[in-house]
């Protein structure tokens, strides 16, 4: 995984710098998201791995599948990625691009998993508190998991806050073992 990220980083950085210079971050994010989805299709994966096809043929087919969703610069990006046999890295490239975009926008995606559904007021309060703690705008994504028993688990990048009953029981069990 780290190797894929290392290989994808220069492409994501180049796309980000181009998009930022032309004030097209949202467009490029959408285009790369589409490219990532297309590259993960089983049929497309077989085509991209086919040794008998040239990089130009792979790029042309990829661009044809995406239709008019790609502007000229995005099509060139796909051609360059194909020339260097990096089309299979498009999911990693898109993820890194979105990470750079979030850093630029001073925002962070936060996954909140709770034992019970959070209403909008609770989500708003939680987003406000997390925004103050993280010093960034928070985009909250809430989900439910009854296995937590109670409480919440918050994931923001590398930060994980486990305030669930299940997490506390696991910590207590670990403490009793030692």
From Swiss-Prot:
Pfam families: OSCP. It is a peripheral membrane protein. Its main location: membrane. One of its GO terms (molecular function) is proton-transporting ATP synthase activity, rotational mechanism. One of its GO terms (cellular component) is proton-transporting ATP synthase complex. Gene3D superfamilies: N-terminal domain of the delta subunit of the F1F0-ATP synthase. Belongs to the ATPase delta chain family. F-type ATPases have 2 components, F(1) - the catalytic core - and F(0) - the membrane proton channel. F(1) has five subunits: alpha(3), beta(3), gamma(1), delta(1), epsilon(1). F(0) has three main subunits: a(1), b(2) and c(10-14). The alpha and beta chains form an alternating ring which encloses part of the gamma chain. F(1) is attached to F(0) by a central stalk formed by the gamma and epsilon chains, while a peripheral stalk is formed by the delta and b chains. This is ATP synthase subunit delta.
């Amino acid at each position: 995984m780290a190797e894929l990220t290392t290989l994808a980083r220069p492409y994501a950085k180049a796309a980000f710098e181009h998009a930022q210079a032309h004030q097209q971050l949202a467009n490029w994010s959408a285009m790369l998201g589409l490219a990532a989805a297309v590259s993960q299709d089983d049929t497309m994966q077989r085509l991209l791995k086919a040794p008998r096809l040239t990089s130009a043929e792979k790029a042309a087919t990829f661009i044809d599948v995406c239709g008019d969703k790609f502007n000229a610069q995005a099509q060139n990006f796909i051609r360059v990625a194909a020339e260097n046999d990096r089309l299979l890295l498009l999911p990693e490239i898109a993820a890194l691009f979105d990470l750079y975009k979030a850093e630029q926008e001073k925002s962070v995606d936060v996954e909140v998993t709770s034992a019970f559904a959070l209403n909008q007021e609770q989500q708003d309060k939680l987003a406000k508190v997390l925004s103050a703690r993280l010093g960034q705008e928070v985009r909250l994504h809430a989900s439910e998991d009854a296995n937590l028993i109670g409480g919440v688990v918050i994931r923001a990048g590398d930060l994980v806050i486990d305030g669930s009953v299940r997490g506390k029981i696991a910590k207590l069990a670990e403490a009793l073992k030692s």
